[in-house]
Swiss-Prot record:
Note: Protein expressed at very low level.
Record organism: Homo sapiens (Human)
GO-annotated cellular components: nucleus
Region (Disordered) residue spans: 21-43
UniProt name for this protein: Endogenous retrovirus group K member 10 Np9 protein
Keywords: ERV, Nucleus, Transposable element
Sequence ranges of Basic and acidic residues compositional bias: 32-43
Organism placement in taxonomy: Eukaryota, Metazoa, Chordata, Craniata, Vertebrata
Location of this chain's protein in the cell: Nucleus
Function field: May possess a function in tumorigenesis.
Amino acid sequence: MNPSEMQRKGPPRRWCLQVYPTAPKRQRPSRTGHDDDGGFVEKKRGKCGEKQERSNCYCVCVERSRHRRLHFVMC
């Protein structure tokens, strides 16, 4: 096979690793902008419109494609 035959058809796959702070589900605030310990939580929207909360813990997002994502929460 020559190199031109080995090329994939379609858009290239993009692998991306994003690390951003987020509150675990059990600690998500009932009051907007505050967590249960009185700290401030910043909310924003991701690339695909998902909600991301920033706090003292970390969430690792492994992006496989534009619409498929794997989320791992580490605290």
